[in-house]
Amino acid sequence: MGFASRPGDTPPATYRKEWENVRGLGLPITQHAGRSIAEIKKFRRIEILYKDKLLGPDVQLIHTYNASPEERGMMAETKTHNSIAPYTASRLASGLPYLGDLLKRGVQCSLSVDTTTVGGNADMFSIMRLMLQLNHLRSMDVMEVQQRRILELATIDGARDLGIADRVGSLTPGKRADLILVRTNDLNVAPFFNPALLLVQQAQPYNVDTVIIDGRILKYKGELTALDADEVVSKAAESFIAARKRAGGPY
């Protein structure tokens, strides 16, 4: 459990009290910040949080594509985390992420989907690939952040960002048995050579052979084992049509 807040949209007295109560419960805090030019024209959330002494290692900022150099410095100084959603950055023309700069400053970063409503899917292979490409465009340097670093952002750094790296995020004795096995002899990934390059720049969900979560096999030989995919799709379609009918829209 965590808390999602939006200082800048709510009165200072309200969000300060909210954060005080949430921190009293020991819960992590997530906060959208610097997503769009329109937002920073109204207020700069990161600067607001910094001046209110609210930033810290228990805070995860989402986006920050339009954070100023000074604001990125504030994040580094306070050890505030940053989760970057590259699909949102490109789909909404929000801006190019400052991934390379944030990593150089020592900011704990990770990758995220944000919302499938905006991004269209939750394919982490595509998210890794897009993040790498957007960073190339931002830095104009294809060597600044490379495939292995992107893979870390999607795995162990995601766990670190969420404060659960002691349980998941890497293949380590004592951690949960979370595994994704990718075929390396499929046409689009063969011949196998560089694991990080293969996963970040070539692999697709189709190439996933087996998925094990906390020791439970959820996918095997390319087939889902824990649910009936056809049933899920059918129920989702029924729910969608019912919602459209209630809203009075076309379906």
Give a label for each model feature.
Residues 35, 86-91, 114-117:
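Short, acidic/turn-prone active-site loops that include or flank metal/cofactor-
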Residues 154-251:
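Active-site microenvironment of metallo-dependent hydrolases
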Residues 64-65, 136, 185, 216:
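Flexible loop residues that form catalytic
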Residues 1-81, 93-109, 166:
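Histidine/acidic residue-rich metal-binding segments in metalloenzymes
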Residues 70, 91-92, 190, 221:
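Glycine/Thr-rich phosphate-binding loops of Rossmann-like dinucleotide-binding domains
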Residues 18-23, 81, 85-91, 238-246:
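Short, electropositive alpha-helical surface patch
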Residues 51-58, 100-186, 202-204:
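His/Asp/Glu-enriched, well-ordered alpha-helical/loop segment
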Residues 92-97, 120-122, 191:
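Short, charged, surface-exposed secondary-structure boundary motifs
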